[in-house]
Structure formats: C-alpha cells, structure tokens
Amino acid sequence: MFLEINFYSTFFQRRPSLWKERCKFEEVDAQGNSISYSHHPPDLTGQRSPLTPTTMRIVDRIPTVVGFRVIPTTVLVLLTYLTIFTLVIVTDWLPEPPKNQNGLDLKQAYTDLRHITAHPHPYNSHYNDAVHDYILSRVRPVAASTSFVHISDDQTSNGSWASPGYGVYFEGTNILVKIDGKSSNGNDGVLFSAHYDSVSTAPGATDDGMGVVTLLQLIDYFAKHRPDRTAIFNINNGEEDWLNGAHAFLQHTWSNLTDTFLNLEGAAAGGRPILFRATSTSPVRAFRSDYVPHPHANVISSDAFARGVIRSGTDYEVYTGAGAEMEGLDVAFYKGRSRYHTKYDAVPYTNGGERSLWAMMETAQGAGNALLNAKRHKQDQGSGGTPVYFDLVKAELVIFYLNDLLIYNVVSLVVGPISLIFFVVCEYVLRNERARQPNGHPVSRPSVLEWLKQRSWLRALWRRSKFWIALVITIALQALLVWGYLAFNSFTVYSSPYLVLISFFSLAYLSLVIPLTFTFNQTQSPTAKYIAPEREKHTLLIQVYIFTWILLLFSTIAVARAQVGGLYFVTAWNTGVWIACLLAAVEGMMLPVPQGGPRVRFHSAHHHHHHEHEEDQDADDDDREQRQPPTEATPLIGYSRASLRKPQEGGVVGWWIVHLLLTIPAPVLLIAQMGSLLLDSLPQTLADGSPAYVVYAAASLTAVLLAVPLTPFSGKLHRGLFFLFFLSFLIVTAYLWLAFPFSSADPLKVFFQQKVTLSNVVSERHSSIMGLSNSTVHPTAGVRKVVTAITGTPYYLKNEIIPRLPSASGKELKCRDEKAKRGLVTCEWESTLVPSPGGRNPWEDDFAAAQGRVGATSKSRQSWFKAEVARTGVRKGQIVLQGRNTRSCRLYFDSRPIIKYVVEGGHEGMQKGYEVGKVGASEVRLWSRTRDREFVVDFEWEDDDGREGEGITGRIACEWVEYESGNLDNGDGQWDLQRGGGERAKIPAFEEVLAFLPEWAVASKTTDGLVEAWSPFSV
C-alpha cells in the first residue's frame, strides 16, 4: 500500500502541473462530514524515488500475490486443505510389495493362506484338524534343520476359567514354536500370537489366516537370523470361542518364558493393519519408522476399545490380564467390517489381496526384530509408561508418555493465558502511545453520545462475539443434521462415510463463515481500511485460542481421570494458536494506527463520484491498472484503488501466512487422520448394534473441528467457496437421505442360529446318596421343536430379509430385543428344516443291543447327545454328558447360578485370576479336543434365602457348526470328509439363508454354535 503511494508521489514530482488541473482534496472530520477544497501538491522538489517504474511495477504486485487479500488467502487455504487431505488418502493406499522382501517369502505365504482358508474351520469342525496338520507340516522341517528351534504340538494343556456370568473348560490344541535367543535370561522372551481357527461362517482370510501365515514366515526368518531374545510362537486354536487358545497357552510351561507379546489379529477384511492397542511405551517403540517402514498407529483406537465403542475381543485381553500381565501390542486389520465373520472374509474378497498380506508381514517383521533385538526400556513399565502414539501419514511414529501430555497440558492452561494477556496489554499500550495527531497531542475522543450514535460499541461487541455466535449456530445445525440422518436414513453412513463427512463439513463451513463475514457499514480512513482485516484476524485468533483453551481444559480432565490419550490433537492445536496469537500481538505493535482526526480522500476531477466494484472485480482492475505504465494522459489518484481500498483488501504482507501455517496444517492433519480412522472403522459396526448417533456424532465432530481452524481467515475467503459448499451440501445430503445404504461390497450383516428342543424323556430313580433323585436324558430323545432365529437391525430384518426366506412364509414371527447385541432384534419362527449332527452315532450299538432289533438304527439318527444328571449332595450335583459328532457342549443353570464346577480329568482348580466370582456362573461351556468326548462335571450351588435342600433346574445342550456347503471338497487334498466315518452334518436352514438372502445382505454366526440342541433337566 505504501509502495503504491510512493509510486504516485514520484509520478507527481515529474508532472506537478497535472496535480492542480485534475485533483482536489476532500477532508472528512471525526463525525464523517466531508469538506471538499482545491489544493496545490506538496513540494516534492529535490526528492527522487529510489525505484524505477519497472521495479515499482514488480514491487507493486507483491501485495497482490502474498498480501492478506482474497485471492492469495483463498488459494493458500485451499492448497493447505487439499494437500493434507490428499496426503491422508494417498498414504493410506497399499503399495506394491517390493522385489527385495528382506528374507520373507510373500509367494509362499500366499500359498499357505489359500490352503488354510479353503473352508471355514472353527474349533468344532473337522477341517480345523486339517488346518492344524498343515501348519504342523510347515514348521516341522524348520525345527528338524535347526538346533535352537523347538516345537510343541500341545495335546495336553487344559484348564478352567471364568468370566462374569459363565465358566469355561477347554482342551487346547495349540502349535507352539520356540526359537532360543542368543542372550536370553530365561524370562524376557517375546510371544508372537495368532489363531488358526475361524468362525463357522467364514474361511478366515484376515481373521486370522494372514496372521498365521505371517507367523510361519517369521519362524522361517528367525530360524535363519537368530534373535537375541527367545521367541515363542503361539499359533493357537479356539480364539473365536472367547479367547480359549490364549488361556490354554497360559497352562503351558513356555508361557513363563515371555514378558512381551505381539498379537496379530483381523477385525475386518484387509487393508493396512493398525496398531490397535498397546500396554506401555516400551513396546510401542518397536513401531518406529526405524523398524516398521510404514507405521500405522493411533491411540484413539485403544480408547475406543476400552470404552466399548468397538465390540470385539482379542487375545490381547488374556495376555495383559491376570495370570499373564505381559506388556505388548495388538495389531489388526480394521477396514471393511461388513465382511468380518462372513463368507466374504475369503482370499478373493480381501481388501488389498497380496498387498494387504505384505503390509502385515512387513509390520510384524519390523516390530518383531525390534522387540527381540532392541534395548529394553524398563522405566516405561507401569502407569508412568502409558503411551500416546500416532503416525504422521504412515511415515513417522510420534510417541510420548501420557503423563508428559498431562504435565504439558497443565502448564499450557496456566502459562498460555498469562503470556497472551501480557502481550495484548503491551500491544494496547504501545498503540495508544502512537495514536497521536501530527502536532503530538493525543487524539480527541468522541463524546459518549456521539459514540452511541456512531454505534461503534455495537460493532466492537459484534467483532468480539460473532465467533461464539457462529459456533453456537454451527452446533445447533450439526445436531439438526444428525437428527435428519437418523430420521431419514440412519444406515447411509454404512457404505458412504466420506460423503457423510462432506455433508457435515459443508454445513460447518457455511454456518461458521456466513456469521463471521457479516459486518456493519462504517466510514474508515485509508489507514483503517488497511489494518481492518488484520485486526479482524487478530480478534478471531484470540477467540479460537479461547476455544482451544476450553477444549484443552476438558482434554486434561479426560487424561487425568480416564487415561484418554486420543485428545493429543487439542494440545497441538492450542499450542499453534497460542504462538500465532503472540505473533499477532507483536504484529499489532507494528501496524499503522488509524488517526481519529480529519481524514483526507483523493478524488479525480473527472470522476468525483467513484463507485467501488465488488471485491474480486476490484482486485482484477487493480492488476490491469498496475500493468499500464503512467503517461501524461493517465488518470491520477482518483483512478487508483490504492487509496480507496475496501477493508477486505487491506493487509500486511507475510504475517498472515505465518499465522495460517501455525493454526491450520497441524490440527487439520491430526484431525483428518483421526477422522479417517473413525470413518473406516465405526460405520459398519452399526450391524453389530452400535448406536447410529455415535457414528454420526463422530463424523459431525470431525467436520466441525476441521472447519474451525480456517475461521481467522474467513473474511478473505472467496465468495465462490460459499456457493461450492452450498451446492455440495444440498446435493450430497439429498443423495444420502435417498440412497439405499447397502450393496454387495458393503453388505448388511445378520446373525443366524437354529435351536432344537429335544423331548424331555426322564427316568426317575432313587440314589443311594441321601435318597435324592436322578434323571437321564436319552440319546434317542425325539425332536420336539426346531426354531430358526435371525438377529439384525429391526427394519431391514423384518421387512426385507425374513420375508424372502421360504421357511418363514406363513409362520408366526416372534421378535424380541437382543440383550447381547444392543440395538438389534432377534426374530424366530418354527421351522420344518431339521438339522442333522452327522458323524457316527456312538450309542448305536448300545441302543440296538438294548432293543434287540435292527430297527434301532433308524431311530439312532435322531440322537444328539446323551446326558445323566444326579444329585450328589445337599447343594451338589453331577452331570455326565456326551455329544454326537461335536467337541462343544453347554450347561445352563436357569434357576440359580453355581459357585463351583470341576471337570473330571481336567486341570485341578481354576486358572489364576479367572476364578468364579461372587455372582456365580449361570453357564458352563465345555470344549474337548476330541469328538464324542464324555464330560463329567461336578458342581455346587448356594441356597437362596436359607431354603436349604432345594434343587436346581436348567438345560443341557450341545453345539454344531458344520454344514454341507462349507465342507465341499474343493480338490485341495487337505481333508478326507469321511475320516471320522458316519454321515455329513447338515444345517438346511442355514443353507436356505445363504441361498435366499438378498445380494446386499450376508450371514454370520450368532454364537459359538450354528445349531444348539437342548433338553431341560432338574435335580
């Protein structure tokens, strides 16, 4: 601005006659009244401009390019946001596997993956044995050729453990590999864990086939590159049935050799694996870019797991729980949860394919090398070592202690406001000292009445409050939009999370920028016009600082009371805005001070009344005028917009760029990364019963936090952005409210189970013990009722899915709210599609001998299990149970919980830290490594209300998971269907679901068994 004035001063020096001919002055007093008069130009004799006209033209363009003006500000803000969003998106893409695979063999791993995931292979299936044998065949040659590699095919470990409400007895079939370290002290080994069982409804490519084949590669690698510490590989079985394989590992002697673990898991359908959870800072250091080429980690995922936002469980919970108390890492896939535990968790449907597998292998190798060979940091253990961690565009990992974050936050809460107040006061004092008229006297102040008439108090009040008004409007409109999504199409975020974010962000931009750019009309001097945008920006910077200070206060409380580490971005944001405010105060000390006395305006004699154009046109006109060299016919000052700038076109060169770089890139990058993680992991948890409002609130909060950093610069953003965001909001929101939310790529998940009620054939007899009665459930008890139950989201389940199933046609549908999966309903109906347990009937010979006729064979096909129940004491009982072609049975105690149970032949006592609690156990889950195993369970209960001697009632049940389409021979040669003899297991109702579900829906399991057959008992 001053450079332009200097240019015209030089021009008038060379042609002073033109001044008198073509110019006159207009004086404006303090009340805004104008007085016009003619005047001669100042005496410029002897003054020479140090710049030539050509140089002046170059210098004049500097404010246009880097000044705090509309075009430069808009361009830089857009470039900043687009660069950050592009980085977040592009760095999340999976790169092609390198040719140099650092001792790993991706091709072999992919071959292993296809073998392991050829069929669903849950613990209670025949194909589970085939997978076990295949893995064993892969590791045995390694142990045979290397002296420090040892294998344990664990067929002996068993135990009992309890969780709130239920108890477990489990017999493990884990495959353990030990690689002796070069300098291990005996108990500082590292555990590598993955599970080779899948759920009954999925082949398990990502859950957890990729984890298993990664461990196979690490075994080969560390056998050739012996580590410093001992490595234990637990390729366990039974994780899907509530983490049983990890519990079984704790029963093995090798569990005493480890104090750190790396667990590989899959909670989705591929993509890039993330460090989901970590116990302490020391193991997280293994994820630094020195070891892991593309670290992907964020502590917010750990916060989400801890608070039940993501309903899932991994072996991490066992390894960190009572009895183990190890420190370690949980690495898992998280994208595409709609395919999790479904038929789409298969090799052909994996998100990323070989690239996804390589990402897991590369991550595990890097972290494993660090854990086995890097120096330990024992000081990190304990509460002081709780970590805060996040990656920066998959290139670097930032790690620090949660306690350090707390200390820094507390200091910032105190030092920040005090220092800022000091700088602002200094700015005010210095500006008042400089605010004097040319004669040195203080500037005259208008009277109170004049001040009120001028409404400058109203302008000042609006300038200092409009940020908060805009924020309140934004929050209200965001809440209204959340309600709109919940009311019109609550599942639209399921398949279009990023469109939902665009909708929220567009609205946030509009609701913030429109109030902030509203101003009162006022008459300003050229100097005031010059500094007005800067003062506006400074005011908004302070408002944003106050906003981040409030966020920092709540963040500090969350860190101190709830150990929430995911709010680290607030700390970074507050620090950046604080520094920007300090610099703004320094800038304010240097800005020209608008004078309160008469102000002079210049007008051309030929254009006394000049109408200002719109801001963008004004800037373009200036550029054209500055490109034209002056001549004698060139219009004088009246045609130069330099002295008639609108307030929006003022601004100091350079300062605003520093402010922008301090306040926008860091918080926007951190928030964008966090928002991307939330939008990739949360939306499809709606099918699991997660509240929809939580997902939309997360998207809304992300959008608002992304928009707030640009508010100090809102006055200089081009009006075209308003129309762009307005149109995008209308179009995107309308589409999302009308679009069908599911597709074959993002199917809605429903949960299946069939229940078979057996006839209660009980024979009464008297026991020699206290004359108490006993009962027997005969193996030939007939099927009394078969009920098919499907769980899912209420509207689509009742109106779009169940009506498509032939077996449900014309049947009475009974629906109830699901307690285990809140937000979902279970609808059931009686079915004529009767399942068959398959296998060989273990009681066929006994039944034929008892009946003395061949006809018993046909009746034996109805057999499911055999059970005997006896009262062995006042508060004691015994159940003998044998299921047909199954490894899994259950005991339900409906009338009262039991306080103790013991399984004959099992490990004595309960696992340390997992004893039956005070509330007792209403259910006991029994798992054996062999089929047709006879369980003998002794149990005790407490009397209620002193009613000693009363018995107990409940149900005896067994589970089945195999169905024909899941066991088809695919020619891989891995499994002989008839190895156990007998018939094939059949679940025709599940086959019906697979055949008749719409293409936008997919089936998963409700619980451990797809079929549960049960019969009541009392004792």
Curated annotation (Swiss-Prot):
<feature type="topological domain" description="Cytoplasmic">
    <location>
        <begin position="1"/>
        <end position="69"/>
    </location>
</feature>
<feature type="transmembrane region" description="Helical; Name=9">
    <location>
        <begin position="720"/>
        <end position="740"/>
    </location>
</feature>
<feature type="transmembrane region" description="Helical; Name=3">
    <location>
        <begin position="467"/>
        <end position="487"/>
    </location>
</feature>
<feature type="glycosylation site" description="N-linked (GlcNAc...) asparagine">
    <location>
        <position position="774"/>
    </location>
</feature>
<dbReference type="InterPro" id="IPR053975">
    <property type="entry name" value="PFF1_C"/>
</dbReference>
<feature type="topological domain" description="Vacuolar">
    <location>
        <begin position="488"/>
        <end position="497"/>
    </location>
</feature>
<keyword id="KW-0482">Metalloprotease</keyword>
<keyword id="KW-0325">Glycoprotein</keyword>
<dbReference type="Pfam" id="PF22251">
    <property type="entry name" value="PFF1_TM"/>
</dbReference>
<keyword id="KW-0812">Transmembrane</keyword>
<feature type="topological domain" description="Cytoplasmic">
    <location>
        <begin position="587"/>
        <end position="651"/>
    </location>
</feature>
<feature type="topological domain" description="Vacuolar">
    <location>
        <begin position="741"/>
        <end position="1019"/>
    </location>
</feature>
<feature type="topological domain" description="Vacuolar">
    <location>
        <begin position="673"/>
        <end position="692"/>
    </location>
</feature>
<dbReference type="InterPro" id="IPR048024">
    <property type="entry name" value="Fxna-like_M28_dom"/>
</dbReference>
<feature type="transmembrane region" description="Helical; Name=2">
    <location>
        <begin position="405"/>
        <end position="425"/>
    </location>
</feature>
<feature type="topological domain" description="Cytoplasmic">
    <location>
        <begin position="714"/>
        <end position="719"/>
    </location>
</feature>
<feature type="transmembrane region" description="Helical; Name=7">
    <location>
        <begin position="652"/>
        <end position="672"/>
    </location>
</feature>
<feature type="site" description="Transition state stabilizer">
    <location>
        <position position="340"/>
    </location>
</feature>
<keyword id="KW-1133">Transmembrane helix</keyword>
<keyword id="KW-0378">Hydrolase</keyword>
<feature type="topological domain" description="Vacuolar">
    <location>
        <begin position="91"/>
        <end position="404"/>
    </location>
</feature>
<protein>
    <recommendedName>
        <fullName>Vacuolar membrane protease</fullName>
        <ecNumber>3.4.-.-</ecNumber>
    </recommendedName>
</protein>
<dbReference type="Pfam" id="PF22250">
    <property type="entry name" value="PFF1_C"/>
</dbReference>
<feature type="active site" description="Proton acceptor">
    <location>
        <position position="239"/>
    </location>
</feature>
<feature type="glycosylation site" description="N-linked (GlcNAc...) asparagine">
    <location>
        <position position="256"/>
    </location>
</feature>
<comment type="similarity">
    <text>Belongs to the peptidase M28 family.</text>
</comment>
<dbReference type="GO" id="GO:0008235">
    <property type="term" value="F:metalloexopeptidase activity"/>
</dbReference>
<feature type="transmembrane region" description="Helical; Name=4">
    <location>
        <begin position="498"/>
        <end position="518"/>
    </location>
</feature>
<feature type="binding site">
    <location>
        <position position="341"/>
    </location>
    <ligand>
        <name>Zn(2+) 2</name>
    </ligand>
</feature>
<dbReference type="Pfam" id="PF04389">
    <property type="entry name" value="Peptidase_M28"/>
</dbReference>
<dbReference type="InterPro" id="IPR007484">
    <property type="entry name" value="Peptidase_M28"/>
</dbReference>
<keyword id="KW-0472">Membrane</keyword>
<dbReference type="GO" id="GO:0046872">
    <property type="term" value="F:metal ion binding"/>
</dbReference>
<dbReference type="GO" id="GO:0005774">
    <property type="term" value="C:vacuolar membrane"/>
</dbReference>
<feature type="region of interest" description="Disordered">
    <location>
        <begin position="603"/>
        <end position="634"/>
    </location>
</feature>
<comment type="function">
    <text>May be involved in vacuolar sorting and osmoregulation.</text>
</comment>
<feature type="glycosylation site" description="N-linked (GlcNAc...) asparagine">
    <location>
        <position position="158"/>
    </location>
</feature>
<keyword id="KW-0479">Metal-binding</keyword>
<keyword id="KW-0645">Protease</keyword>
<feature type="binding site">
    <location>
        <position position="195"/>
    </location>
    <ligand>
        <name>Zn(2+) 1</name>
    </ligand>
</feature>
<feature type="transmembrane region" description="Helical; Name=5">
    <location>
        <begin position="540"/>
        <end position="560"/>
    </location>
</feature>
<dbReference type="InterPro" id="IPR045175">
    <property type="entry name" value="M28_fam"/>
</dbReference>
